[in-house]
From Swiss-Prot:
This is Actin-75. The keyword Amino-acid biosynthesis does not apply. The gene is AC75. Actins are highly conserved proteins that are involved in various types of cell motility and are ubiquitously expressed in all eukaryotic cells. Essential component of cell cytoskeleton; plays an important role in cytoplasmic streaming, cell shape determination, cell division, organelle movement and extension growth. One of its GO terms (molecular function) is ATP binding. It comes from Solanum tuberosum (Potato).
Length: 377
């Protein structure tokens, strides 16, 4: 008889930028690595490397000079299943060192994902990896489990996509979910672009990684953008140095807050979309008038692109300006929000009430991929 510990469910949050994977019941993911697959530019150049045809995650990053990179997930949706399969293979066998056929696997997906995407995910889990049981849960429902609040409005912003998801009594309200194809990767691109104004050029995918690092270390959100710009003209207090991998040191100033400002003003990068504050407001306004007070009073931030210092205060200020004046606005930025979707999945997969959500291999064999729409919410 297998030990209960051996059948811990695996939880895999496949982000556009990073894969977060680990075991249900843990409080943080064991493996966090970039969602990239690199292939050698020229076959046969790497002598004695025992030439692999593909490298995944950190290994692809460390060999960046000789590989071309691909991101199999764009805007939260898988666009290259062969590469995605490589990422999952790497997750199970190299990172977690488990045999997927012995575990239930919980995968997360972006809300409003195409149905075919969800079917294909399930199919690969059963047919390629022979998983014991699988389930797909929408990212936000998972984030809610971590927040433990009955009614909340979740703003989840990752690398490829942002969503606002109102949650009431533990359920996401699908009619009010709004999707914004603006997230971390766009901010990285924008930072690279405004750095060219200073005469620095970052164009290759490897250089973009340096810019991402700079963004994560130095960017912040201004409470008042115009005021911050004025301040920069008269003082150098905003300026910070950043050392590039080759030892060159560059100085950045206003770029630090001009970069994530795009979240509030997408028009800066030519996007005709509402900012994250307005999208959150629109999403709340799509809900029943009786629950809006609860949603305004519990706006929960989640995902890596909500990690910028100053985001909660700015969000609070912007939503207060949009909402009725009597409304009490509270923006919550939990410290573990970078992994809140994964943590929520970990909690969810270990709940006894979740056990009926798993799709067993036998059910899949009988009904085919479409079973995923009946069982997963």
């Amino acid at each position: 008889m297998a030990d209960v510990d051996d059948i811990q469910p695996l939880v895999c949050d496949n982000g556009t930028g990073m894969v977060k994977a680990g075991f249900a019941g843990d409080d943080s993911p064991r493996a966090v690595f970039p969602s990239i697959v690199g292939r050698p530019r020229h076959t046969g150049v790497m002598v004695g490397m025992g030439q692999k045809d593909a490298y995944v995650g950190d290994e692809a990053q460390s060999k960046r000079g000789i590989l071309t990179w691909k991101y199999p997930i764009e805007h939260g949706i898988v666009n290259n299943w062969d590469d995605m399969e490589k990422i999952w293979h790497h997750t199970f066998y190299n990172e977690l060192r488990v045999a997927p056929e012995e575990h239930p696997v919980l995968l997360t997906e972006a809300p409003l994902n195409p149905k075919a995407n969800r079917e294909k995910m399930t199919q690969i889990m059963f047919e390629t990896f022979n998983x014991x049981x699988x389930x797909x849960x929408x990212x936000x429902x998972x984030x809610x489990x971590x927040x433990x609040x009955x009614x909340x409005s979740v703003l989840d912003s990752g690398d490829g996509v942002s969503h606002t998801v109102p949650i009431y009594e533990g359920y996401a309200l699908p009619h009010a979910i709004l999707r914004l194809d603006l997230a971390g990767r766009d901010l990285t691109e924008h930072l690279a672009k405004i750095l060219t104004e200073r005469g620095y050029s970052f164009t290759t995918s490897a250089e973009k990684e340096i810019v991402r690092d700079m963004k994560e270390k130095l960017a912040y959100i201004a409470l008042d953008f115009e005021q911050e710009l004025d301040m920069v003209k008269s003082s150098s207090s905003v300026e910070k140095n950043f050392e590039l991998p080759d030892g060159q040191v560059i100085t950045i100033g206003a770029e630090r807050f001009r970069c994530p400002e795009v979240l509030f003003q997408p028009s800066t990068i030519g996007m005709e979309a509402a900012g994250i504050h307005e999208t959150t407001y629109n999403s709340i306004m799509k809900c029943d008038v009786d629950i809006r007070k609860d949603l305004y009073g519990n706006i929960v931030l989640s995902g890596g692109s909500t990690m910028f210092p100053g985001i909660a205060d700015r969000m609070s200020k912007e939503i207060t300006a949009l909402a009725p004046s009597s409304m009490k606005i509270k923006v919550v930025a939990p410290p573990e929000r970078k992994y809140s979707v994964w943590i929520g999945g970990s909690i969810l997969a270990s709940l006894s009430t979740f056990q009926q959500m798993w799709i067993a291999k036998a059910e899949f064999d009988e009904s085919g991929p479409s079973i995923v729409h009946r069982k997963c919410f």
